[in-house]
Amino acid sequence: MRINLTTRRKWLMLPLTVLLVATIALIGCGGTPGDEGGLSGSFKIIGSNTVEPLSVVWAEEFMKMYPNVRIAVSGPGSGVGIAALIDGTTEVAQASREMKSTEIDQAKARGVDPYEIQIATDALSVIVNPSNPVSELTIAQLSAIYTDQITNWKEVGGNDAPVVAISRDTNSGTHVFFKEHVVQMKGLPTADKSLEYGPKVLFLPSTEEGASEVAKNPNAIFYPGLGYVTDEVKLLAIKKTADDPAILPSVETALDGTYPVARPLLYYTNGKPTGVIEAFIDYCLSLEGQQKVIEAGYVPLGK
């Protein structure tokens, strides 16, 4: 189940890998009144490597407000988090992609009712080494790079040097989103669902590793979330088609819809959240929580 925009806006008006806790005893999804702060309870948030830093910030702040609450956050990938929700080994799955229909069917078969909550937005950025003279690419050019049809930077106006295309691994929601919306060019006249990542693409298990490789390798290209971009790499402007303007990723361009590779960041719970988890998500969607989104380098929910 997905929260519609009207409901999400109402939530926004409510007042109001890192493990934050090494070992916790799970005591269920519902919180109980505590001696300090009025809430107590423990739960896990497992999933997206992209969402992990934001969840860590929120969890740290929430546990300061409610000392009897314990939240453990880990980011092995969206697919792992969704599988954990289906298996009942996490209370919250964090994801940088929507659940697949097959995953929803698996969940329902196990008595799990996936409930989707958008908690922020992300501009999926394309980065290269600062020494790379290329400043912009079209979606079609990116697709050609990641399907091994373009293998030399000179083919897109760069140096005569081999392209080193880096991707997240298959457990990553970022991997899936980029495949659908860039590699397969979803929504464009040239869309092709048969396209796959090429055999020359280098798959890495974390966003940090991909960004680090681009900072060191003058021929590398990668696609981290906006929150992972540093001054050690160079952002490329992206054109939806050759006739469209080249747009750099930013909070502003993601919010106004001009950046072509923006995506929702999501939490999934088993049914509508209650108790301490509901209170935590209320905080995430509050004005204070959304300010943390901006501070962490992500895009807040639009009003």
Task: Please report, for each region that a protein language model flagged, where it lies by residue.
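Bacterial N-terminal signal peptides that target proteins for export
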Residues: 3-16
